[in-house]
Amino acid sequence: MNVITNFSPLLKDKELIDDLPIVIRVKKFDESAAKEFSEKMSLAHNTGQPVVPVIIDSYGGQVYSLMSMISDIMHARIAVATIVQGKAMSCGALLFSFGKEGMRYMDPDATIMIHDVSSMAIGKVEEIKADAEETERLNQKVYKMMAKNCGHHEDYFLDIIHEKSHADWFLEADDCLKHNLANHL
């Protein structure tokens, strides 16, 4: 994740640079990316910009880091526009759905992939059972949130994933429009 910082060499005045719009790029979902996302969201609030563009091009990552980013978006005082370039897979697809209604953009050649939350549980039987319960709780939570964001009943995406035998579900841009994930191509 990075903020666009390659300004014109004609901009010498630091105050002008501080007021430029912040654009957030999300390429991965881990603790450092979540921290950087939070910092950039805070900076965006101080620019006076009416919208924070969040550009997603990611294979996914850690769900807890995604939850931190979602929290930042939900507590934002300005609108968040999400934009998919290339791919938004797993956590990337979920984050995409948190763009403000009417502000979810997708490149016509981009792909989204949705699947069950996964776990790398190892350990004693009871630890694995506890991890499986937490994985199921997270799975239910994030896909119900996604369904709400897209104007569907809460089990909409969970039902489709179940119908697809819990396999990875790849969607092209046109399919994302049909499911109200994307608002614009």
Question: What are the residue ranges of the model-derived segments?
Answer:
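Catalytic phosphate/metal-binding cores of nucleic-acid and nucleotide-processing enzymes, i.e., regions
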Residues: F7-E15, L43, D72, I78, ...
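Short, surface-exposed connector motifs at secondary-structure boundaries
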Residues: Q49-V52, M74-V80, E154-F157
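Glycine-rich beta-to-alpha active-site loop
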Residues: Y59-G61, S68-M69, I73-S119, S165, ...
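Second-shell loop/turn segments in exported
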Residues: V23-K28, I55-Y59, E126-A132
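A structural preference for short, pocket-lining loop segments at secondary-structure junctions
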Residues: F37-S58
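Terminal peptide-recognition signature
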Residues: F37, V54, F96, I112, ...
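STAS-typified acidic loop motif
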Residues: N2-E39
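Charged, glycine-interspersed solvent-exposed loop segments at helix/strand-loop junctions
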Residues: A121-L185
